[in-house]
Structures are given as structure tokens and as C-alpha cells.
Amino acid sequence: MDYSRLLKRSVSAALTAAALLCSTAAFAGEVTIWCWDPNFNVAIMKEAAERYTAKHPDTTFNIVDFAKADVEQKLQTGLASGMTDTLPDIVLIEDYGAQKYLQSFPGSFAALTDKIDFSGFAKYKVDLMTLEGQVYGVPFDSGVTGLYYRTDYLEQAGFKPEDMQNLTWDRFIEIGKEVKAKTGHEMMALDANDGGLIRIMMQSGGQWYFNEDGSLNITGNAALKAALETQARIVNERVAKPTSGSNDGIRALTSGDVASVLRGVWITGTVKSQPDQAGKWALTAIPKLNIEGATAASNLGGSSWYVLEASAEKDEAIDFLNEIYAKDLDFYQKILTERGAVGSLLAARTGEAYQKPDDFFGGQTVWQNFADWLVQVPAVNYGIFTNELDTAVTANFPALVKGTPVDEVLKAIEDQAAGQIQ
């Protein structure tokens, strides 16, 4: 008998068994997750958890549904106090706030650069969660934007779907004036106290409130300047119906008061909430600014998942996110069909769900349109003070509407912002 060979086989078998035992033990914990919105983020995370536990039955999940503000407050408090045992293993963070957490609390989130293949995700999503060469989040839903419009109103005003292709903002305003004159409907709703439209236009021009080094990018920001001027024209030329707050804007949309809405893909469910409007809507790319480098793609909103560095289940949490959010293409088909969630994993765009015509939109493949625009969204530096800049912009915008030169308004925005963020 060859005892040497037998010994080698025995050792090999023992090592294999030990490896399997360690692997099994590594995935037998409870992963706690904080997020908001029971009908969207929470429901989607529950679906992801079910898929993972089907292959890893020893793993359990505790998915906690908080209001968005409560998630942010509890996360801020836990990180600031150093009481990491009060924090979850995974937390959902809105993309606009990602850098604020990463820069304010260095070392608090797990670096995932070597754990997940980020080349498969939309670049603009990866960039916003990257700090000093390390990627700290797993991209989730996109806020890629589109222009939804009422085909019946446009037809009454003498416009065809081809007139809504390759729009500029100048042309959009011209069409809006015709629609108002001939149908009595404003082209869109606009809450001048909300910075959303300004941000959409600014990012479509490839710029943000901040430079790459985090310094303010206001007075020399061509995209912001053009966005402010464009929104002022929309107000002064009465193309928009004035609204106050998101609920008021939704009422203007669903009641049929306005002819279009320009928002992130997440508004699709609201647009489709009125069955009697089926077949009366269409989708097109957003208008372009008249500046060098402008695109017809942008983003509004969106969130991503982050693993806490101090998590006792860190490796398990990372493996879960990698297996489901970075690899499971069928998962993305299901959450698109059931929740209207357009994910950031590019490979998922070729699935059947994305290519299905939607009768509500006259048979358009709306999800495929959003998937195509997703890769065109310019990557920008959201910085850590987007909310403060929004406040400065909306506070100074009325002066522009009343005739103050745009360069003076930009200087006032910069001065106010500089005081707020010091």
C-alpha cells in the first residue's frame, strides 16, 4: 500500500472539509439593514434577502424600515458618538449625501474596491461613492431622468412625437408657449423653492456645485448659469404652473393640469397611476442646454448600499451585496417589473423586462430608453454640501426672475454658500 499517497489524500480531504466548515460558519449570522420606503427600498431588499437565503439558509436578515430622515439621524448620531454597536451592518444612503458621510467619518465604511467588480456598474454611480481611489458602496437604483409628455395635449397644439425628439431648452420653451396658448395647459409644474430642475440641468451639462477638489464651483459654472437662466425664462414666459411642495406637483401631474413632467425614472409609477390617461403619454430624452459639452441625460435622486466597517457580519454583508446586487441579473428584471426600479448594473439592461412595450406609453419600451440614457449621465462630484447649495440657489433665484443680472445672482449664491459651509 502507498501510505504516502493515502496520507496526502487524507490531509487533502481534511483541509477541504475544514474549508467547507469555515465557509459555512462565515455565513451564519444575522445581517441588519436600515432603509426607508416600504414599497420600494424595503420591499426590494426583502426580495434580495430571500434570494440569498435560498443558497445560504443559515443567514438571517433583519430589515428595518425607518423614515429617511430617521435613517440619516441615527446614522449620524452613531458615527459621531463612536457607538458603532448601535449601527446596522448595511445602510442605505442617498447618493447626494454619500461623500458627506465618507469624508466626515473616514474609516467608518468598508472599502469594497477589491471585493466587487465595479466595472459592471454605471460610472457616475461608482464615482459618487469613491474617495481617494477606494469605492465604498454598492450602486442601487438610478435616478436617470426623462421627459414624460401628454401626446394628446401636444397634438392639440399641432405637435407630433417627432417634434419632441432632440430637444433644446429653447425649443422646449417655444413648444410650451404654444401648448399653453392652444390648450390652456402649462407645459410643466415648477416649485421654485425646490432645486431639482436646476440640478438636473446642471448635471446634464457635466458640472455640479463643486469642483473635483471640493471647492465651490459657482461663478465660473457655465452649466449652473445656463440652468438658472433657463428656469427664469420658464417662469417669466409662463410655461410652468407654479406649485408648492411635492404633493402639489404630483396633483398637477395626475389631474391633467400640465402637459409634461421632467423627473427621475422613479416618477413612472405616479405617471401611470391614472388608468384613464393610458395611451396619452410618451417619453423622450430631456432637453439640452446651449453650452459646450451639454448632454440630454441627467440624474435626480437615487441611493446606494454601504457596509459599516465595524460590522461583526461585514464579510457576510459584502458577500450578500456582491452575490445579489452585482451578479443576479434576474433580480433586476423582477424589481423592474414589480417595483419600477431601474438598477445601475449595466448587464441587466438586456433583459426581457427592459424590452417589453408599455401600452400606457403608446407601446414605447420606456425601460429600455432609461437603460440607454443611464450610461450617458455625466459623472460629477456631489460634494458634501449639496443641500446647503440648494438653499442658496433657491434663496437667490427670485432676484433673477425680477431682473437681477445672472452674474450678480451667481456671486450672491457663492457668498451665501461660503458662509453656510464654513
Swiss-Prot record:
Q: What induces it?
A: By lactose and various galactosides, and subject to catabolite repression by glucose, galactose and succinate. In strain AR50 the expression of the lac operon is constitutive.
Q: Where in the cell is it found?
A: Periplasm
Instruction: Please give the GO cellular component terms listed in this UniProt entry.
Output: periplasmic space
Which domain of life does this protein belong to?
Answer: Bacteria
Signal peptide stretch? 1-28
Summarizing the function annotation, the protein's role is: Part of the binding-protein-dependent transport system for lactose.
Region Lactose-binding: start and end of each range? 246-277
Q: Which UniProt keywords apply?
A: Periplasm, Signal, Sugar transport, Transport
What's the chief localization of this chain? periplasm
Q: What is this protein called?
A: Lactose-binding protein
Statement: the UniProt record of this protein carries the keyword Iron-sulfur: no
Record keyword Isomerase present = no
According to its UniProt entry, this protein's organism is Rhizobium radiobacter
What family does the Swiss-Prot or TrEMBL record give for this protein? Belongs to the bacterial solute-binding protein 1 family.
